[in-house]
């Protein structure tokens, strides 16, 4: 091997450093960069958005999901380099589905006016069910919003939960007939645009809904060995089992090429069965590590995941647990230690 002299090495050093920076950036994006945190604002004791964005930056949280186009938050995100998933709230779907002009106005007011905010996805609706009045408006609203943002390179999707999916083991996953009639045209649209499907994945609810048959360690990523065998795939955690059940359902519905982004997952610290700081800490930290490596059905590729949620929300409606999903208290102090690396 020919040895280079000192001067040639020094001359090549800037190029080597540049290449190294690309390698490190790529690694960082596939590991830390896959994790975001949902910023719900249903509380009367939350701090100003500028302080919240600063907290994201201090904690190295590089992605945020925001459930409505709150102008204070969008302004605070300017120049932050935090990648944003911005929701179109369900009550707006009918209006945006009925008129391209309305969709254009929504995008102008909430996206184009914030050129120095990094928009990752627009989620058109959250957990809309086939029986909901808004169900028929999801796809046309997605189409109108997509036309309005297509020149900006922003992907458009919608977020679903797993109520419309059944089957065990994961390879038997399928959409229920009612849900399939709703989701099939959405799948076709997403496939044509190479956009991901957003899925809210909550092992907590599966566990508390069937504590007789589902083990807590399987739910918290702490099972010492395989719990579910499914052909060539083995499952040691419920999160992956749910995720792969959705993938199997997509494959049966013509959406085998789609990628799933987990748009919500977390664990409450109070208000119901199996809640508490210890379980929440275990779940969230293990989730962050687990999603780096893909699932048994889709191995080798990190799963982009958004933890629910940044703060407790004392104005949230529904069961008491709905108020206690936060990683942080309203005073910006952590409830428990989370390693976002």
Curated annotation (Swiss-Prot):
Residue runs in coiled coils: none
Entry's Gene Ontology molecular function annotations: cellulase activity; glucan endo-1,3-beta-D-glucosidase activity
Single GO biological process annotation from the record: carbohydrate metabolic process
EC annotation from Swiss-Prot or TrEMBL: 3.2.1.39
Localization terms from the record: Endoplasmic reticulum; Secreted
Assigned keywords, A-Z: Endoplasmic reticulum, Glycoprotein, Glycosidase, Hydrolase, Secreted, Signal
Keyword Acetylation set for record: no
Any single Gene Ontology cellular-component annotation: apoplast
Disulfide bonds: none
Reactions that this protein is recorded to catalyse: Hydrolysis of (1->3)-beta-D-glucosidic linkages in (1->3)-beta-D-glucans
Regulation: induction: By infection with a virulent strain of P.syringae pv. maculicola. Induced by infection with the biotrophic powdery mildew pathogens Golovinomyces cichoracearum and Blumeria graminis. Induced by infection with the turnip vein clearing virus (TVCV) and cucumber mosaic virus (CMV).
Active site per the UniProt annotation: 127, 264
Pfam families recorded: Glyco_hydro_17 (PF00332)
Glycosylation sites: 116
Functional note: May play a role in plant defense against pathogens.
Protein name: Probable glucan endo-1,3-beta-glucosidase BG3
Species per Swiss-Prot/TrEMBL record: Arabidopsis thaliana
Gene name in the database record: BG3
């Amino acid at each position: 091997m020919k040895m280079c002299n000192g001067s040639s090495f020094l001359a090549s050093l800037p190029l080597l450093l540049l290449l190294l920076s690309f390698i490190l950036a790529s690694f960082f994006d596939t590991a830390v960069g896959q994790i975001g945190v949902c910023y719900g604002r249903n509380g009367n004791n939350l701090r100003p958005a500028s302080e919240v964005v600063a907290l994201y930056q201090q904690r190295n949280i590089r992605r945020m999901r925001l459930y409505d186009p709150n102008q204070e938050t969008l302004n605070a995100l300017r120049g932050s380099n935090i990648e944003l998933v911005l929701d179109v709230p369900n009550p707006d779907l009918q209006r945006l589905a009925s008129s391209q002009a309305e969709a254009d106005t929504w995008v102008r007011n909430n996206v184009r006016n914030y050129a120095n905010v990094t928009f990752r996805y627009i989620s058109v609706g959250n957990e809309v069910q086939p029986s909901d009045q808004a169900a028929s408006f999801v796809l046309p609203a997605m189409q109108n919003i997509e036309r309005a943002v297509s020149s900006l390179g922003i992907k458009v999707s919608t977020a679903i939960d797993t109520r419309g999916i059944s089957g065990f083991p994961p390879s038997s996953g399928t959409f229920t007939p009612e849900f399939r009639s709703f989701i099939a045209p959405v799948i076709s649209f997403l496939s044509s645009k190479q956009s991901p499907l957003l899925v809210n994945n909550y092992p907590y609810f599966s566990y508390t809904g069937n504590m007789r048959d589902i083990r807590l360690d399987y739910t918290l990523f702490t099972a010492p060995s395989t719990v579910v065998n499914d052909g060539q795939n083995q499952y040691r955690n419920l999160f992956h089992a749910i995720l792969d059940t959705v993938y199997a359902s997509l494959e049966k519905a013509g959406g085998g090429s789609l990628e799933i982004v987990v748009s919500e997952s977390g664990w409450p610290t109070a208000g119901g069965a199996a809640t508490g700081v210890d379980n929440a800490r275990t779940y969230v930290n293990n989730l962050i590590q687990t999603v780096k490596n893909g699932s048994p059905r889709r191995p080798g590729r990190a799963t982009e995941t958004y933890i629910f949620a940044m703060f407790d929300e004392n104005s949230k409606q529904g069961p008491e647990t709905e108020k206690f999903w936060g990683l942080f208290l309203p005073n910006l102090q952590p409830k428990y230690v989370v390693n976002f690396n």
